[in-house]
């Protein structure tokens, strides 16, 4: 689960990570009021959306006066902000973060993330922080410091010193930086985060360190332990179809293609998307209904995919195990009759009660295209578009 920058900074404050003074605003007047309360200019007016690259997209402005703060707030609030992470459709800006400007001596990069390859935690840092960190990582990866932390032993003093020395911090800033990184690690672990990112982490002219930006991603599977964090979820920032799918415990991710697919099992779903691409088409989604899906869950999954206007055909790929083919077929028939099928639907089923499942589909009167195997299914759905 992603949260907004202003929410992430509130968490930072709770754990003793220094951030600029500021406040969230939902209107131009609120933004001006926050700016007035900061006691002087410049102030920074920042769009609040769940995407990076806001500065390059025009969503971050430095205001030198109240007049500029008002103007920038009016320009950013309500705009459709397009960044490399939003896609061409962009995101509407519905809230702002207004913060006190800082005297920046140096911009750095700092993050903590889960490294699934080593089943550990990695601290990443760089002296090249700021808007071009992606370019730095791609073209000069040697400038990225990586320190692996064993979660069983936790953060140790030598990890803190290794990162601090790697960032080239002056001696006067090392103690404060070590405290910041230690607190950040504590926040990461206690809140079941998958990513914490500060870009930029700044070194001020008086050798202080401060998080000028904040990104926090929380493991959605751990939210049952964090009822307070669940309240930070902003459904307006999420895909409406993904929100709908989550209500029915369906694993759904909306993509850019035009072939919808329904599969049971994450691995089989990814293989299905690969073979759709191999056949010359593009998957419109990832949809795993799970092994324990009921007919109702299947019905909801099919209805969600049919509501996606990009979808021009659907591929259903089911291997019946815990989810029997007859149960799946009943769900498909119910959903199709309720929604009305106006696009080609290719079905490939194997496994438990497959003959009964095929019988249910055949007797339904629906115009479904049967496939003998996965390759045949992909070729038929690609040809049907």
Swiss-Prot record:
Q: Boundaries of each ATP-grasp domain copy?
A: 9-244
Cited Gene3D superfamilies: ATP-grasp fold, A domain, ATP-grasp fold, B domain, Succinyl-CoA synthetase domains
Where is Mg(2+) annotated to bind?
199, 213
Q: Which InterPro entries match?
A: ATP-grasp (IPR011761), ATP-grasp_succ-CoA_synth-type (IPR013650), ATP_grasp_subdomain_1 (IPR013815), Succ-CoA_synthase_bsu_CS (IPR017866), SUCC_ACL_C (IPR005811), Succ_CoA_ligase-like_bsu (IPR005809), Succinyl-CoA_synth-like (IPR016102)
Pfam families in the record, alphabetically?
ATP-grasp_2, Ligase_CoA
What Enzyme Commission number does this protein have? Answer: 6.2.1.5
According to the UniProt entry, its GO molecular function terms are: ATP binding; magnesium ion binding; succinate-CoA ligase (ADP-forming) activity; succinate-CoA ligase (GDP-forming) activity
Positions contributing to substrate binding: 264, 321-323
Gene Ontology CC annotations of this record = cytosol; succinate-CoA ligase complex
Cite a single GO BP annotation. Answer: succinyl-CoA metabolic process
Q: In which pathway does it act?
A: Carbohydrate metabolism; tricarboxylic acid cycle; succinate from succinyl-CoA (ligase route): step 1/1
Name which cysteines form disulfide bonds. none
Reaction catalyzed: succinate + ATP + CoA = succinyl-CoA + ADP + phosphate; GTP + succinate + CoA = succinyl-CoA + GDP + phosphate
**Required cofactors, per record?**
Mg(2+)
Subunit arrangement?
Heterotetramer of two alpha and two beta subunits.
PANTHER family hit by this protein: SUCCINATE--COA LIGASE [GDP-FORMING] SUBUNIT BETA, MITOCHONDRIAL (PTHR11815:SF10), SUCCINYL-COA SYNTHETASE BETA CHAIN (PTHR11815)
The UniProt family comment states: Belongs to the succinate/malate CoA ligase beta subunit family.
| Function, in words | Succinyl-CoA synthetase functions in the citric acid cycle (TCA), coupling the hydrolysis of succinyl-CoA to the synthesis of either ATP or GTP and thus represents the only step of substrate-level phosphorylation in the TCA. The beta subunit provides nucleotide specificity of the enzyme and binds the substrate succinate, while the binding sites for coenzyme A and phosphate are found in the alpha subunit.
Q: What is this protein called?
A: Succinate--CoA ligase [ADP-forming] subunit beta
Q: Which gene encodes it?
A: sucC
């Amino acid at each position: 689960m992603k949260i907004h920058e202003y929410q992430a900074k509130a968490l930072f404050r709770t754990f003793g990570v220094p951030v600029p003074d500021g406040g969230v605003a939902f209107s131009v007047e609120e933004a001006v009021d926050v700016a007035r309360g900061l006691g002087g200019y410049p102030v920074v007016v920042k769009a609040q959306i769940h995407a990076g690259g806001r500065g390059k997209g025009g969503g971050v402005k430095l205001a030198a006066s109240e007049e500029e703060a008002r103007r920038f707030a009016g320009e950013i609030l309500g705009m459709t902000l397009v960044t490399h992470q939003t896609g061409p459709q962009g995101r509407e800006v519905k809230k702002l973060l207004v913060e006190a400007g800082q005297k920046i001596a140096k911009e750095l990069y700092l993050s903590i993330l889960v490294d699934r390859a080593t089943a550990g935690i990695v601290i990443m840092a760089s002296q090249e922080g700021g808007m071009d960190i992606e370019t730095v990582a791609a073209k000069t990866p040697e400038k990225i410091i990586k320190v692996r932390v064993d979660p069983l032993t936790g953060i140790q003093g030598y990890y803190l010193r290794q990162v601090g020395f790697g960032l080239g911090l002056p001696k006067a800033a090392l103690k404060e930086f070590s405290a910041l990184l230690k607190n950040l690690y504590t926040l990461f672990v206690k809140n079941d985060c998958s990513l914490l990112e500060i870009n930029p982490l700044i070194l001020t002219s008086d050798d202080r360190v401060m998080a000028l930006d904040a990104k926090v991603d929380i493991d959605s599977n751990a939210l049952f332990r964090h009822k307070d964090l669940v309240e930070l979820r902003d459904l307006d920032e999420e895909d409406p179809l993904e929100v709908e799918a989550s209500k029915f415990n369906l694993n759904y991710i909306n993509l850019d293609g035009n072939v919808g697919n329904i599969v049971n099992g994450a691995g089989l779903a990814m293989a299905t998307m690969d073979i759709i691409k191999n056949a010359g088409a593009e998957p419109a989604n990832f949809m795993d209904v799970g092994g324990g899906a009921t007919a109702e869950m299947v019905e909801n999954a099919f209805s969600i995919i049919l509501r996606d206007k990009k979808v021009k055909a659907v591929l259903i790929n089911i291997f019946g195990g815990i989810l029997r083919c007859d149960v799946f077929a009943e769900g498909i028939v119910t959903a199709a009759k309720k929604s009305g099928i106006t696009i080609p639907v290719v079905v490939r089923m194997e496994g438990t009660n497959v003959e009964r499942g095929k019988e249910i589909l055949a007797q339904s009167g629906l115009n479904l295209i049967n496939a003998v195997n996965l390759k045949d299914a992909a070729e038929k759905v690609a040809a049907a578009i």
